[in-house]
Structure formats: structure tokens, C-alpha cells
Amino acid sequence: MSNMRGFLVAGVSAFAAVVSVVSAPSAGAETTADRAHSFSETTSVGVHNSYEKATFPYFADALDSGASLLELDLWTNGGGPEWRVSHMNPVASDSNCVGAQDAAGLRSGLRDQGLRGCLADMRAWHEADPEHPPVMIKLELKDGFTAGYGRGPADLDALILGTLGDAVFTPSDLMGESYSTPDAAVAERGWPSVSEMTGKFLFELIPGTIEEGNPLDTEWTDQQYATHLRDLSAAGLVQLGAAFPAVHRVSPGDPRLDRYADPGIRPWFVIFDGDALDYTSGDVDPQWYHDRGYLLVMTDAHKVAPQIDGTHASEAEASERLDRLAGEHASYITADWSRLPNVLSTVVPRR
């Protein structure tokens, strides 16, 4: 694996069965033909809390499952070391990650590793299969960033890019040389083609439940990271940014307008994440996101009426839900369907 981006940090497909793949679009306005084969024109399936041992015994099992989105919950407070991966424990990791050094170690060694170990597993898995379909890694920062302990936005960038290097598809990759923000890039050129995303990880950041409920936290993960990207770009260092901040939760119209007082950070959001039930309630128009090339993550897909089981749905039920929400313009739908590999590996046209 090329690790050029990691060097810079130190210094400062299933869908092919549905549509044929075309060559990379040229610079300039996106054409209808280009868009039909764009990464943003797919709908696929993710697994909630993929790091939990009850969901997958090892994180390698999550990566092997075919799921297009996997979720990690991170804790950063000073009560414990580094970036912990856990659902409820704020001071120690409780995860299925082992910190593998190579593919042979993906299902051996001690689990309960933090983010560093999960990224090592991803690296080992990627090196064993560098042509894997793209995987979105959703990071929920349960209690936000804690920059004073070396757990701020730049520290996260350095850890991700220093481990995975060019296997990460970054905001800079989306922008290329022609566009100043991700929003400008998707508006004019769109996302890369499906084939161009082969072998890539994308990182999505959302604020966590503890952070969102903390009245003393006035700058959540999404705002803080978007500001960080904006500042990196102003300094000519946007290539050091590893992740895409997402607008979390659902509101009508362009949710960035009310959410972010600083208009300078709004164009750094091209991923939106919220409950499927809210996006399909009739109060929000999900086509608005699709028309603009934004990625739309619909969580708790099973709760859309008629509600189905979030963990033990049948393959037919989950497949029907995927098809239905693809028709509601979802890019990803998520639930806890870890035991449905045929569904997890399915990618359908977004419509």
C-alpha cells in the first residue's frame, strides 16, 4: 500500500452487477451520464456499532461481512488512554479490534483495542485485499474531541492517515486541484466513479450522544472538525485532513444554515446523517440531498413503517427495506443486520 499521505502527516465491486463502470469524469460540470455511474448514485447497507463482540467476534469479521458502512464509537476524555472504542465504558476500550500486524493476525491476540488497533486491523485487511469495495467508517465521538490530551482533530488526522495512508479517500481527494471546498466539488464534478473508489476507506464524523447532551460543550465534533478543515485549506494543507464531518440529525431545508453560524464552514459538509424515520416522515425532502450530490446516511432503517426487527429481520424483509429506502434517496441504510451477509453486500441504484 502506498503511504505517501502518511509521510505527509509525519512531516507536518458489487455495484458493477447493477451498472457498468465508466472512466473518471473530466473536470467541469458533471454530465447526466457521469452521474449515473457516480459513487453517490449507490445505496448500500451498514452495521450499527460494528465494533461490539456480540455483533462480530472480530473487526475483521465486520470488514469481511460485505457491509459498506461500519461504525466505531470513540471516547477521548482524560479518564483513560488514547482513543477508546466502546459503547458505554468511557475510560477503557471494549471492542472486537485486535491491532493486527498482518492478515494472519486478524483473528488472534487480545481484543479490546482502541482506535489505533482498529485502524491496524483495517490496514492488515486492506493489504490482503487492496481491491475491496469502498467502506465508510462512521466515527461517533461520544464525548467529542479532547485536544488537551492529544485527541483533537489534527491528532485524529495523523493517526488515520499515518496508519492507512492512500487507502483513505479524503476531502482533498474529492476537491482535487480544481475546487476549494467539497461542496463545490460535488456540485460541479460530483463524486468519483464506483470503480475509482475501489480499495478506499471514507471516514465520517458525527457528534456523540454524550457531547450532544452536554450543556457545557458549545462546539461539537462536526463544527470543530469542519473549522479545522477550513483552516487547513487556508494554510494550503488540506491534504492533511482525513475525514468528512457530517451534519447530524434531520431538519427541513438546508440544515447547515441554522446549524452553523459561520458560513465559511458550511461548504465542508457533504454528508448528512439521521434517522430514516425522520427523513421519510414527509417533513423533509430527501431528494434535496440527492439532487445536490450529497451522501445521505439513514440510520435505524428498520423503524420505518412497517417496522421490522433491527437485528433479526429476514433476508427478504431487509432487502425490501434497502430497496424502499434507495427509492427515498438514501446513500446508506444502517441497522444491526450483521447476520445477513447477502443483504450487507448488496449495492443498488439510488433513486
Tell what function each PLM region has.
Residues 1-29:
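Secretory targeting and sorting signals
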Residues 31-351:
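Catalytic cores of phosphodiester-bond hydrolases, prominently lipid phosphodiesterases
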